[in-house]
């Protein structure tokens, strides 16, 4: 159903695994996946317009999760596939309400990412 997205995720996955091995001990290479749909132009224009955007999270959740990963010591993880919400929970975040596009929705009403559903 989502060939281009699937190919992109698969390619990213192979790059993470390959580069993590190639650059072992020099740089950590990881992937970060969203737990839910993220409010992006692609979601607005291709996935479902306003209804999809309303059931999405803000891009800032990915930025905060990336910051959490990049703040770790390099030796702590490489070749890993992280999920934004899980990383933030590990750092103590418990309220994900501020990341919702529509604050009236509960987390269980948000659209899950294609590959995590």
Predicted features and spans:
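Catalytic loop of short-chain dehydrogenase/reductase
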Residues: 1-26, 33-50
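C-terminal helical subdomain
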Residues: 31-32, 49-117
């Amino acid at each position: 159903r989502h060939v281009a997205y699937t190919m992109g995720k698969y390619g990213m996955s192979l790059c993470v695994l390959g580069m993590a091995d190639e650059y072992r001990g020099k740089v950590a290479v990881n992937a970060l996946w969203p737990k839910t749909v993220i409010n992006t132009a692609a979601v607005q224009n291709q996935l479902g317009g306003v209804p999809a955007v309303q059931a999405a999270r803000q891009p800032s959740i990915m930025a905060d999760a990336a910051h959490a990963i990049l703040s770790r010591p390099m030796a702590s993880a490489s070749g890993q596939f992280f999920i934004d919400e899980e990383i933030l929970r590990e750092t103590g975040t418990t309220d994900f309400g501020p990341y919702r596009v529509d604050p009236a929705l509960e987390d269980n009403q948000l659209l899950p990412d294609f590959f995590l559903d």
